[in-house]
A protein has these predicted regions:
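Secondary-structure boundary elements
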Residues: 115-117, 155-178, 217-230
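Active-site beta-loop-alpha junctions enriched in small/polar residues
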Residues: 10-12, 126-130, 182-186, 236-242, ...
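Glycine-rich anion/phosphate-binding loops
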Residues: 95-111, 151-164, 305
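Catalytic-face loop-and-helix region of soluble metabolic enzyme cores
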Residues: 253-373
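Acidic, His- and aromatic-enriched active-site or binding-groove loops in soluble protein domains
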Residues: 142-160, 196-223, 254-267
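Active-site-proximal loop/short-helix segments
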Residues: 122-141, 172-203, 239, 252
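Alpha/beta catalytic barrel-like cores
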Residues: 1-126, 131-145, 319-321, 333-373
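Structural preference for beta-strand elements that scaffold enzyme active sites
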Residues: 2-8, 12-16, 45-55, 120-122, ...
Length: 373
C-alpha cells in the first residue's frame, strides 16, 4: 500500500546548543546522523512514510553549508573561498579542503550511525543553475557569465554525485539513495535578476529551456554513473511558470515547490501556475511541498490552502494522497525572490533542527487523515 504522505527534510540539520558530548566522542557528524535516524529512520505510522537524509549542512563553520557541500562534489574541480565568494579555479584552498573533509566525515559517520539501516536515504545538492549564480570564476565574474563553464557543471556534478553515492552505498548497504536537487535561485536566474560583481547591473536572463537542458544532462549523467533514475530525483524549483513547464516537459518525475510562495489561484498568474502543477500531477509527476513547521511558519494555513486550491481545480482531497512534505525554514524563499545574493552564506538559524522536524512529524497524522477520505 502506498503511503498517504512522506515526511522528510531539506537536507540541513543544526544541532542544538550543548548537544555535543562525550557520548559520541564529541563527533557532531555522528551525533547529527544518530538524531536524524531517531527522527526519520522509522515510519511513525503504517501509512506515513519517512525519507531519512544525509545532512549536507550542519552550520558548524563558514564552510559547512549547502553551497560548499555541493562544490566538494564537483568531480575534478578545485577552488577556494575568496573575499567575494566561492571561486572555481586552479588550486585547492583551505576552505575548499575543509568542505571536502566535512563530506568525508559525514560518510564515515554514516557507517556507524546507520548500521543495519534499510530504506530511503537522501543526499542534497544545489542544482547547476543555482551553482552558476552562486559561484565565481578566477576573473571575479560569476560562473553564470561563462556559458561554457555553465554547460560543464551538470556533468561535473553528475560524476561527483555518482562517486559520492557509490561510497554511500558501500557504507550503508541497505540504503536506497535519493537526490534532492535544490534550485533555490532558478527564478532569479531565469528572470535576469542576478547582480554582477559591481552591483550596477544584472546578468541577462537565462532561458528556462536552457535550464532544462542542464537538468537533462545531469539526469542522464546520473543514470549512467550511479543508476539513479528520475523517480529517485526530486527537483526543487521556484514559482516561475516557464521553469515549472520546462521541468515537466523534460520528464522530471518529482517536483518540490513551496506553496507559501505560490500566488493565489484567484489571480491570473496563480491560475496558470496551479494548472501547470495539476498538469504535472496528471502526467504522473510526484509533488513535494516544502513547508515551515516552526511556530509562526504558517504551515497549517498553507496546507489548508493547498487542499482548497486542489479542490477548486476539480480534484478530490483524496487526490493529494501520496504528496511528500519537506520540512524547510523558508530561508530560500527570499533567494527565489531575488532579495539576498545566492552566493552569500546563510545564517545557521536557517537550518533545520530537531524541533522543526518533530513538529512536521506531529502534523503528519492529521494531514494523512484528511487525504484518506
Amino acid at each position: 500500500m502506498s503511503p498517504l504522505v512522506t515526511i522528510t527534510g531539506d537536507g540541513t540539520f543544526r544541532l542544538g546548543t550543548g548537544a555535543i558530548g562525550n557520548d559520541v566522542a564529541e563527533d557532531p557528524f555522528l551525533l547529527a546522523l544518530m538524531r536524524l535516524r531517531s527522527l526519520l529512520g522509522d515510519p511513525p505510522e503504517e501509512q506515513i512514510a519517512t525519507r531519512l537524509y544525509l545532512p549536507s549542512a550542519l552550520g558548524l563553520d563558514d564552510t559547512d553549508h549547502l553551497l560548499p557541500a555541493t562544490l566538494a562534489l564537483l568531480a575534478g574541480t578545485s577552488g577556494d573561498l575568496a573575499s567575494y565568494g566561492w571561486r572555481l579555479g586552479p588550486g585547492i584552498g583551505r576552505a575548499w579542503q575543509r568542505a571536502q573533509d566535512v563530506r568525508d566525515r559525514t560518510l564515515d559517520a554514516a557507517r556507524i550511525a546507520l548500521l543495519g539501516y534499510e530504506g530511503p536515504l537522501a543526499v542534497t545538492a544545489m542544482g547547476p543553475v543555482t551553482l552558476a549564480a552562486a559561484t565565481f570564476l578566477p576573473s571575479g565574474e560569476r560562473t553564470l557569465a561563462d556559458r561554457g563553464a555553465v554547460r560543464d557543471l551538470p556533468m561535473l556534478l553528475a560524476e561527483g554525485l555518482g562517486e559520492h553515492l557509490a561510497l554511500l552505498r558501500e557504507r550503508v548497504p541497505g540504503a536506497r539513495p535519493h537526490l534532492l536537487l535544490r534550485e533555490d535561485a532558478v527564478n532569479a536566474v531565469v528572470e535576469g535578476r542576478i547582480p554582477t560583481p559591481s552591483g550596477r547591473r544584472t546578468y541577462p536572463a537565462f532561458p528556462a529551456p536552457e535550464a532544462g537542458t542542464l537538468w537533462q544532462c545531469l539526469m542522464a549523467g546520473l543514470r549512467t554513473v550511479s543508476v539513479l533514475d528520475p523517480e529517485s530525483i526530486t527537483l526543487g524549483i521556484g514559482t516561475d511558470v516557464t521553469v515549472l513547464r520546462t521541468a515537466r516537459e523534460i520528464g522530471v518525475r518529482r517536483l518540490a515547490v513551496s506553496p507559501a510562495r505560490l500566488p493565489s489561484l484567484e489571480t491570473p498568474a496563480g491560475r496558470v501556475l496551479w494548472e501547470e502543477l495539476a498538469a504535472a500531477h496528471d502526467s504522473g509527476c510526484h509533488l513535494e511541498l516544502a513547508v515551515d513547521p516552526r511556530p509562526g511558519g504558517g504551515m497549517t494555513a498553507v496546507l489548508d490552502g493547498v487542499l482548497e486550491s486542489w479542490q477548486k481545480l476539480g480534484y478530490a482531497v483524496r487526490d493529494a494522497a501520496g504528496f511528500t512534505l519537506i520540512a524547510h525554514t523558508g530561508a530560500s524563499h527570499a533567494v527565489r525572490s531575488g532579495k539576498p545574493d545566492p552566493s552569500q552564506q546563510p545564517a545557521a538559524s536557517t537550518l533545520l533542527d530537531e524541533a522543526t522536524i518533530e513538529a512536521l512529524l506531529r502534523a503528519a497524522p492529521a494531514w494523512a487523515e484528511r487525504v484518506e477520505r
